Amino acid sequence: MFRPSTSLALRSTLRQLASASNQPIPPGSEINAVKRTVATILPPIRLYRRIIRAHRRLDPDMRAVGDNYVKDEFRRHKNIDNPLQIIGFLSSWKMYLDQLEVQQGQPGGFRGQRLDPQLLEKMSDEQIYQIHELMTATQEAYSDKAQAFPPEKQRELAEKAAADAGLSVKKDE
């Protein structure tokens, strides 16, 4: 997954990351959340595994989208050598994990969050395009007009079509 380079600075950074806390950050101000997140960054493989584990509590469709996105992002960033980029990447994913864990503990589960307009202004065109693609994919997964339906919806449609045709459908138990 993530292979640290032989540079001394990166080794010391990874050593500091390995000694970080596992506790999720409670909701609070964004500035304090960033400071606390940086103080509790997890090593890359451990962070990746915790995110994948947290996704298990999502809806199956959201889990599939989230797992694929996380896997792709970690693959894209596995050869980064710049410690600042590594810290930025890991702290952003740690903030996501903390938000996911806090929201999953609340009634109604994970609901997501709107992006900060200031954050959008700082993004490159490629990053904005990636977010737009992710938004489109998730909207299509839950749209009644979409060509591909989530698995539960496909079963419902198949059962309805069979009932309309006068056929009985065997139910799995």
Curated annotation (Swiss-Prot):
Plays an essential role in the assembly of succinate dehydrogenase (SDH), an enzyme complex (also referred to as respiratory complex II) that is a component of both the tricarboxylic acid (TCA) cycle and the mitochondrial electron transport chain, and which couples the oxidation of succinate to fumarate with the reduction of ubiquinone (coenzyme Q) to ubiquinol. Promotes maturation of the iron-sulfur protein subunit of the SDH catalytic dimer, protecting it from the deleterious effects of oxidants. May act together with SDHAF1. It holds the Pfam family Complex1_LYR_2. It is found in: Mitochondrion matrix. Residues 149-173 are annotated as: Disordered. Keywords: Chaperone, Gluconeogenesis, Mitochondrion, Transit peptide. GO terms for biological process: gluconeogenesis; mitochondrial respiratory chain complex II assembly; succinate metabolic process. The lineage of its organism: Eukaryota, Fungi, Dikarya, Basidiomycota, Ustilaginomycotina. Belongs to the complex I LYR family. SDHAF3 subfamily. Its main location: mitochondrion. Residues 152-162 have a biased composition (Basic and acidic residues). Residues 1-59 form a transit peptide. This is Succinate dehydrogenase assembly factor 3, mitochondrial. GO terms for cellular component: mitochondrial intermembrane space; mitochondrial matrix. Interacts with the iron-sulfur protein subunit within the SDH catalytic dimer. PANTHER family: DC11 ACN9 HOMOLOG, SUCCINATE DEHYDROGENASE ASSEMBLY FACTOR 3, MITOCHONDRIAL.
